């Protein structure tokens, strides 16, 4: 399953932002996979922190092969040591089992997250061990498919914005200017900023000042 968007969102963004309109026309529709199972999405994002996408995919495949369905029962039955054997660090395995325990004993209302506003959902998710604000926002986008997520703390988003809008730096004030312009479809804009940052359009440059080499 891919992040759902279509003509309505594209038309709105292109009308609001000429430079982004050019990017959208060049790239076309973007397919980004989503995981609509909130429990497994939280675990998947914890695993992926500070490792490559390839390493994350390898560990995730091992986990799926080993346990099949990823839920609180299978995680708690596995325990920290078995999770470590899959290539997960001790600290992350602790975060994962703590999350599973909270879901199991209902001290974390995982179903209730879906009913909350973006701000409330981010606050709830980032109260979990191992989940910061940036990770919570990624869960909102790539699991819950919330339509208006744009993260200032995402370095690739900042890079993409510099490349699209020809800025040397994206400070908070500039970021908020674009966020307001692209709202309520910031999530779709995020997909294009990530694509640009990743080199989807050859020849586009990053306008960030080059770092001075130390003598």
Q: Which residues are covered by each model-predicted region?
A:
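Alpha-helical ds-nucleic-acid-binding substructure associated with the helix-hairpin-helix region
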Residues: 19-23, 51-52, 56-127, 181-183
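Short amphipathic alpha-helical interaction patches enriched in hydrophobic/aromatic residues
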Residues: 46, 79, 83, 107, ...
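C-terminal accessory module of base-excision DNA glycosylases/AP lyases that mediates lesion recognition
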Residues: 1-30, 119-120, 133-142, 146-215
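A positional/architectural concept
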Residues: 8, 15-68
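Short alpha-helical scaffolding segments that buttress acidic/His motifs in well-ordered protein cores
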Residues: 42-47, 96-100, 139, 189-193
